[in-house]
Regions:
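Generic short N-terminal amphipathic or hydrophobic helices
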Residues: 4-5, 29, 74
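Positively charged, polyanion-binding regions of nucleic-acid-associated proteins
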Residues: 8-30
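N-terminal amphipathic/basic-hydrophobic helices that include classical n-h-c signal peptides
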Residues: 1-12, 45
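C-terminal regulatory/interaction module of P-loop NTP-utilizing enzymes
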Residues: 37-43, 48-54, 59-60, 65-375
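Short acidic, hydrophobic short linear motifs in intrinsically disordered regions
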Residues: 28-39
Length: 375
């Protein structure tokens, strides 16, 4: 029979020596039961051993003696930011888009971002006119980091500020996008802010530029130089009177007052819109300047009629880009226009098609969906 001699545990034993003994007895993966047995054999307290093994703990009641201290630190560091890559290693500067054309309020928005001053900015305008894209490209041109948050009725403090997350049986604080932007000195873009509920009021102190106290963990976050907030919306925070933007809400007056400046974003002028569509057309591998010019003239007439109250729908710049792209795919004007305006009701769709027929003398008006399919 093999005889085992149990030696008294040396209280001055190093962590390396203790780990080596544990490996010899139980292997590299050990449990609470293994440690308790080891403590009983060596007349040592459970707390003393687990303290030595703290860097090797992988989950509750489990240790892996092959895990290095560096690996553990790397794992812990990865949970300090919303992504797996540590915040300091991420690049949040948007890419420059070759299809972008500056127009309207873009120079002013760019100046605000370039100043690195804390100057909350509210941008309002109809759908598809480049509000968000303009902010993104201003940051791209200036090399500024941008964190975009799409606001919904469900967005709350946990989504914006952060909260505790359950990781390997432990609760770990997880920064939200607002804290990330504060600490990085980035531009925080609150997209479609008029969809928010009253839970958005958790940003009141942030909109004053004074930082934010995280009451759940007792830490105050100072805003880094360059931090700013830009909000975009289809309304001015007073709801949608005509019902075009269902889901938008009336925002708190005190909240809106914290935005010192508001820009009203309009659709680009005819000349600018032609230039913009040419850029997109080139990126799609299509070159038909005549078609682009007719499309812009058509959209301009529709918008003027909309502003005068003659119709309830309009063609956005984004919709024109959709049509140009559809044209590069289907190689047919009628089909490209029709499939891109099918989202409107039949009466509106028919009136839009008839109007384009008047704008473009060479256009062949389709009679039915079936006839378009045959073209």
């Amino acid at each position: 029979n093999n005889t085992f001699i149990i030696m008294p545990f040396e209280t001055k034993m190093t962590s390396e020596q203790a780990i080596e003994k544990l490996k010899n007895l139980y292997g590299t993966e050990i449990t609470t039961a293994d440690i308790k047995a080891f403590c009983a054999m060596n007349d040592i307290t459970y707390q003393t051993v687990t303290k030595k093994l703290q860097p090797f703990k992988v989950s509750k009641g489990k240790w892996n003696l092959e895990v290095t201290v560096e690996a553990v630190e790397s794992i812990e560091k990865s949970f300090n930011s919303p992504a797996v890559i540590p915040a300091s290693e991420k690049n949040l500067v948007p890419a420059v888009d070759a299809t972008f054309l500056k127009f309207g309020n873009f120079p002013d928005v760019k100046k605000i971002i370039q100043s690195k001053q804390f100057y909350p900015t509210f941008i309002t305008g109809l759908s598809g006119n480049g509000k968000t894209f303009g902010v993104e490209q201003a940051c791209a041109q200036l090399g500024r980091e941008l964190i975009r948050v799409n606001i919904t009725i469900e967005t709350d403090e946990d989504d914006l500020i952060g909260g505790f997350r359950l990781i390997d049986g432990n609760t770990v604080w997880h920064n939200g996008p607002v804290i990330e932007a504060l600490e990085r000195g980035a531009i925080l873009l609150l997209d479609e802010i008029d969809l928010a509920s009253n839970k958005i009021l958790c940003l009141q102190p942030v909109l004053e530029g004074k930082g934010l106290f995280l009451k759940k963990i007792g830490r105050f976050v100072e805003p880094k130089n360059g931090f700013n907030i830009i909000a975009t919306a289809n309304t001015k925070g007073k709801g949608s009177e005509d019902g075009r933007f269902i889901g938008t809400n009336v925002l708190n007056e005190a909240f809106l007052e914290r935005f010192p400046v508001t820009f009203e974003q309009a659709y680009p002028s005819v000349n600018n819109e032609i230039k913009l569509l040419r850029l997109h057309s080139a990126s799609f591998g299509c070159h038909d300047d005549e078609f682009i010019t007719k499309l812009v003239d058509w959209a301009d007439i529709i918008r003027k009629t909309f502003y005068d109250g003659g119709i309830e729908e309009l063609i956005s710049t984004r919709r024109l880009v959709h049509i140009v792209r559809a044209y590069t795919i289907f190689k047919n004007k009628a089909k490209a226009i029709q499939v891109c305006i099918n989202r409107f009701d039949d009466e509106t769709k028919q009136s839009f098609m008839e109007l384009y027929d008047k704008v473009d003398a060479d256009f062949e008006m389709p009679e039915t969906n079936e006839s378009v399919e045959k073209l």
